[in-house]
């Protein structure tokens, strides 16, 4: 089982279709919140029989997934705490990205990387979020054991417990 979290688009649909044709055993899960534009996702994805949609159940979806593609800030931390290997995608309109990139001073965009102060998960931004890159990164996740990533997730989890969340809040404030 595999999780695509948050916003779905034609790129996701193409990717799910690709894996249906090339590896029919793979099942995708789309984890959404009730606040998401439910009708958009259901309409776009309805003919994909290798995709299930779940609402407001991110933790269980991530726990059941072998790996994930995450497009939500808090879901990246949830996936790390569930020790679910992932890569992160962020794509927004150009103006929003331009403004945010000038306001936020961080080398990373995902919470696991920010809190670890190093790259532990791959981040794809803006134009990097395309079909070829998603297939490439997902193939890497599927074909590696991801031990180092899981070890980094364990270390992050321990550091959040041991630092009594002070590190979490200080890093977030510095952004």
Language-model segments: which ranges?
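Single conserved hydrophobic/aromatic residue that forms the stacking wall/gate
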Residues: 1-12
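A short, well-ordered alpha-helix in the C-terminal region of glycosyltransferases
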Residues: 147-159
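Glycine-rich phosphate-binding loops of nucleotide-dependent enzymes
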Residues: 33-40, 69
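Nucleotide-activated donor-binding/catalytic signature segment of Leloir-type glycosyltransferases, i.e.
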Residues: 41-57
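C-terminal alpha-helical cap of glycosyltransferases
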Residues: 161-175
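A conserved nucleotide-sugar
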Residues: 16-33
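A donor-sugar binding/catalytic signature common to diverse glycosyltransferases
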Residues: 55-103
């Amino acid at each position: 089982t595999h999780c695509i979290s948050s916003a779905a688009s034609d790129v996701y649909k193409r990717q799910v279709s690709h894996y249906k044709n090339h590896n029919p055993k793979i099942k995708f899960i789309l984890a959404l919140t009730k606040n998401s534009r439910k009708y958009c996702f259901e309409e776009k994805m309805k003919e994909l029989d290798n995709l299930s949609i779940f609402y407001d159940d991110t933790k269980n979806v991530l726990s059941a997934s072998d790996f994930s593609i995450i497009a939500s800030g808090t879901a990246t931390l949830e996936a790390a705490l569930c020790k679910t290997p992932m890569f992160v995608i962020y794509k927004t309109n150009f103006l929003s990205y331009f403004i945010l990139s000038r306001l936020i001073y961080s080398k990373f965009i995902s919470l696991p990387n920010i809190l670890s102060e190093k790259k532990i998960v791959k981040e794809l931004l803006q134009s990097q979020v395309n079909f070829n890159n998603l297939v490439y990164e997902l193939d890497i996740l599927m074909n590696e054991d991801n031990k180092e990533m899981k070890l980094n997730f364990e270390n992050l989890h321990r550091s959040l417990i041991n630092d009594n969340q002070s590190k979490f809040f200080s890093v977030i404030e510095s952004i």
